[in-house]
Amino acid sequence: MPGRAGVARFCLLALALQLHWPLAACEPGWTTRGSQEGSPPLQHELIIPQWRTSESPGRGKHPLRAELRVMAEGRELILDLEKNEHLFAPAYTETCYTASGNPQTSTLKSEDHCFYHGTVRDVDESSVTLSTCRGIRGLIIVRSNLSYIIEPVPNSDSQHRIYRSEHLTLPPGNCGFEHSGPTSKDWALQFTHQTKKQPRRMKREDLHSMKYVELYLVADYAEFQKNRHDQDATKRKLMEIANYVDKFYRSLNIRIALVGLEVWTHGDKCEVSENPYSTLWSFLSWRRKLLAQKSHDNAQLITGRSFQGTTIGLAPLMAMCSVYQSGGVSMDHSENAIGVASTVAHEIGHNFGMSHDSAHCCSASAADGGCIMAAATGHPFPKVFSWCNRKELDRYLQTGGGMCLSNMPDTRTLYGGRRCGNGYLEDGEECDCGEEEECKNPCCNASNCTLKEGAECAHGSCCHQCKLVAPGTQCREQVRQCDLPEFCTGKSPHCPTNYYQMDGTPCEGGQAYCYNGMCLTYQEQCQQLWGPGARPALDLCFERVNAAGDTYGNCGKGLNGQYRKCSPRDAKCGKIQCQSTQARPLESNAVSIDTTITLNGRRIHCRGTHVYRGPEEEEGEGDMLDPGLVMTGTKCGHNHICFEGQCRNTSFFETEGCGKKCNGHGVCNNNKNCHCFPGWSPPFCNTPGDGGSVDSGPLPPKSVGPVIAGVFSALFVLAVLVLLCHCYRQSHKLGKPSALPFKLRHQFSCPFRVSQSGGTGHANPTFKLQTPQGKRKVTNTPESLRKPSHPPPRPPPDYLRVESPPAPLPAHLNRAAGSSPEAGARIERKESARRPPPSRPMPPAPNCLLSQDFSRPRPPQKALPANPVPGQRTGPRSGGTSLLQPPTSGPQPPRPPAVPVPKLPEYRSQRVGAIISSKI
């Protein structure tokens, strides 16, 4: 019967499948995996990767470079791998706890590690991130829309499964930070394009342009339990997370170095609960105590607990390097380390000042996971930063944030073993410029990593042309006013660690305080939100708006996740209130919250900012540190600063106590050491010296060259002033003509004179005679010697009059006299007549005259009386030129014949002209 035949065929088919199943599990091929209800079955392929190295990883030694061949969808992929030698800092430690709660800290048991970065051979813009500790785990990005996950099969020594990354399921979740997520496309193209620009190995020369984060990872007790109480498995997962995060941030020119790892094997060391806010602040408080024992830049907690709501991570904004807030918490929501790594990278991004991506920022589609800084994450995981993140990071660094990121770990004891030619300076090496075929350093022998003959150094910003630069040479400039410059010591080729002024140090002329290397003001924050021209609103706006305790006016969220009302004392630490003429804030998904307050009949406008979130986020979820809040570290009053939504006294920074030991001649840096002003010597700035600190290196010694130059300049100016004073006093002596012979008077005349006519200072100015017309005799002089002169106190004596053609009056004098332009025209004359010898003895002091021709009188400083000399009178000459006339009555003295004035040497004329020209 047809029915029985159908049943028989079904049974035979089922039997065949049962017989075939073991073979399918042992041979390469596609199989199905369980999937969520309503989704198609997910497939993975069973493979056995093939190593092409002298020794296979996992047998005691992991090679520095390796070639791995895997099959994926019928295609062989050749992976070129290189060990991530910068993943672990030299000071890396591991800490666990005994049952009694005592910490047990150890260093690495082996110099070998098993974490790699690489590419797919012959595939442009590809990227590989793997670990080979126990089997092969990691991510293989082939092209823009094709990437694979590879992981070992449980209880198998060689088999692995490989599947497309979109088949990795992650629970949906979001960050507590208030923002909305974008959608776009081609995430892998952007990600691999960014990673391609980075060198395959990070060379010593590149360290100076890199930012370096010393990361401390902590797994709480719930995470330890989630890994079946296996301490080694928990540590391996955290190491994998760090390896992925390092790969993500390399595209931003940032390296992540794991400086410490801690597993809470016997209970939590801080309060960890389902509340992400209380967990965050409890962990940050615990971290402050850790800093005294273990130096690091940033700490992240990985918890096995599930946070309430949809929050999977939380972190403060713009807090990188902060003693109080540089850290975050992330929930372990995936069995695969890459899912958790995306969340950790997201929270570190908030510490870097990155907000959630707005629309059109991310070029990765939601179907491919979107971008790392999206507000919500889920299926699949994000892997790339957006271009908006780059801009926000640059802006954060330019404002002085991330000061600790230049403090790169000493690479002389890198975790991973020593090898000449790996590009890292290690113990026993004088230099390392990479392989011989790629070394371009003229100071280093690539074959044996030694310095060439005569070379003192080969690497570092304090090494120039193979020589150490002089002590005091600046090697790192001061970025902003809260930063401090660093100087070479003359003993090391490397620039000292980057230091900045201690938190709580006044800046902006006392209008703000330094915090985390930044000088934060309300004005600057308003301009960041609204653009140029924005300014903070009146204090009344802060008090009225933030007293509401709602979405639009609050002092952040409390430990229960609810908005807090601001007390009048804390009002200026809540939502920032600004005044701006702009229609809306600069943030693409932000809206303006406008409030109008009436005070004594005056309308006051207050403008706040609210970042719009999607409907799924608006319901109860959000971060207390949204962009519309006043930033931590902003001055809210005298000796008060905003901290955690409260206006607190700055005494907890201990700045005043530290500053006292600097004796008023320096400031404290973030290492609590004095940075002395020039002229004072560290460590306490109480003795003369060049300045600087024990941390930042010495300031350059004062050079004697500028001092000598200054002394000579002062002496020259003094000599000029004395000469001018002498000439001035001589020119104001009344009725004392010189008794020197005529030739000597030529030699001792003043080489130049400053005009008192208020002219333009030109070398040959037109003089403004301050004497009424008809009161002065004006004679002409050779053109090369016509210079300004001081007016004498009285008319010239008779012996200075000569019979010669009259000189024209200056144009402005002719205009004042009402004469015609022709009357003031210049009359060229080649030579003037010699003056008659004096009829009486001359005074002993020489008269200081500008010109060596004494036929022209000196104009007086003030107007002469109507009849300056009794018995004389004046009358106009033809052509409008006024000449002083002798008395009309009485006998006239005989006049000697006119004798030509000898022509002066040419060099004298040039010298006079040069001196006066220098006064223009």
From Swiss-Prot:
Widely expressed, with the highest expression in bone, heart and lung, followed by brain and spleen and relatively low expression in liver, skeletal muscle, kidney and testis. In bone, primarily expressed in cell of the osteoblast lineage and not detected in mature osteoclasts. Residues 27-703 are extracellular. The chain crosses the membrane at residues 704-724. Residues 27-204 form a propeptide. Binds 1 zinc ion per subunit. Interacts with SH3PXD2A. SUPFAM superfamilies: Blood coagulation inhibitor (disintegrin) (SSF57552), Metalloproteases ('zincins'), catalytic domain (SSF55486). It comes from Mus musculus. Residues 825-834 have a biased composition (Basic and acidic residues). This is Disintegrin and metalloproteinase domain-containing protein 19. The lineage of its organism: Eukaryota, Metazoa, Chordata, Craniata, Vertebrata. Residues 417-503 form the Disintegrin domain.
